[in-house]
Amino acid sequence: MSDDNLLIDATTKIFEDLCDPQNINAAKDDSWKQLLWNALEESGLTSAWVPEEFGGAGASISDGFSIIEVAGKFAVPIALPETLLGGWLLSNANINVPKGIMAVAPTRPRDKVTIHSNGTLNGQVRGVPFASEADHIVAAIEDAGSTKVALVAKNNCEIKSFSGLSGAPRATVLFDNVDAISIHNLQGDLSYRSVKLMGATIRSLQIGGALMAILELATEHAKTRVAFEKPIAKFQAVQHNLAKLANETAAAVAVANSAADTLANSPNNEQAIFFEASSAKIRTGEAVGEGTAIAHQVLGAIGFTEEHILHRFTQRLWDWRDDFGNESEWAVELGALVAENGAAALWPLLTTR
């Protein structure tokens, strides 16, 4: 992860000023979204992973991951991580990166986009975050042994919008003989699985950030909520639950950061990246189940109300858990790798992390 405290502080300040969950809860409309997006775009955060020669900020992979983790701490309900991922994909396919919001497809392992012999795109992809709000959709495509990236104008696709568990916009996107603005091969050693692993790591970092936020919320509530003439934090059962929540949070943050560091520092070590990123998505997904249950237990009925901000974090965690493969899907792939390598290779694989 990035050591650039100025970047982290600047990102945090933007979110504190324009994306405070309590202020969003009280907002009467969505006008705050455009203000927030403008601030992020003007600061260069939306194009952090786009090289300078493509008009971006040219930040490192580690810097981008730090931006994403901070976004998770605020449960940012706009397509910043998706736009960062879209910019990374396009620039790694030598495609000029447009301004504005981007969605990335597919985010479900079984969904596919295909290229017809005439060059048009076909396929149906489900649950695409922020597709209805995006200006462009970036599609990753497996084609004849290579991986292609396509930039598509959203208005050329059929968008069937719905709300995710958190209320944030999602959509089923239908590509029906759609002409892309540009289609190029993904460069270097990057593959279709690389895209999935990058997406999984991004969601793991967001999950880790959001779990840090709900740990703070639950701990503060336990210190101030009085029952039987003393704060509930004094009760052993509550202390035990908070300790479990802290453990889940620490594990999620550690494994997500480990995956991010591997992607940033060993970009050509495909097996290490797969092991780290798949493990991160499995472990953070498990932490979502345990952590959100505990947070709602500690806060009780108030945590379920529309007025309280806890649901802004927990419901987004439930959404993020399934994006780019849930823990069950990644566990199958990770188990297959371990079985393929054989029992003798398992211990060295674990101890060299």
Regions found by a protein language model. Name each.
Residues 75-78, 88, 92-212, 216, ...:
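FAD-binding core of flavoproteins
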